[in-house]
Amino acid sequence: MAVQLRIGIIGDFEPTCHSHFATNAALYDAATKLKVPLEVRWLPTPSLEGPAAEKILPRWDGLIASPGSPYKSFTGMLRGIEFARTHDWPFVGT
């Protein structure tokens, strides 16, 4: 059995935002095609403002900066990006 891939999306999910819905759909479509178990979780930007970010972000195999700003916390978004850059973490920004 394949190891589960865990992707954290840094952003504030809005179910009515087409790009947010499409991001989830694209990830799950790719995982299905590749037969890779996938866990996707949106990481709200306010949760990444403080020291908790250093505990939250390493749990994920890769990070995506969500499309569709503005973010509830620009500081939280920047902390997520900074974590990926300084830890050489897999990261996609849109």
State where each predicted segment sits.
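N-terminal beta1-alpha1 cap of cysteine-dependent amidohydrolase-like domains
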Residues: M1-T94
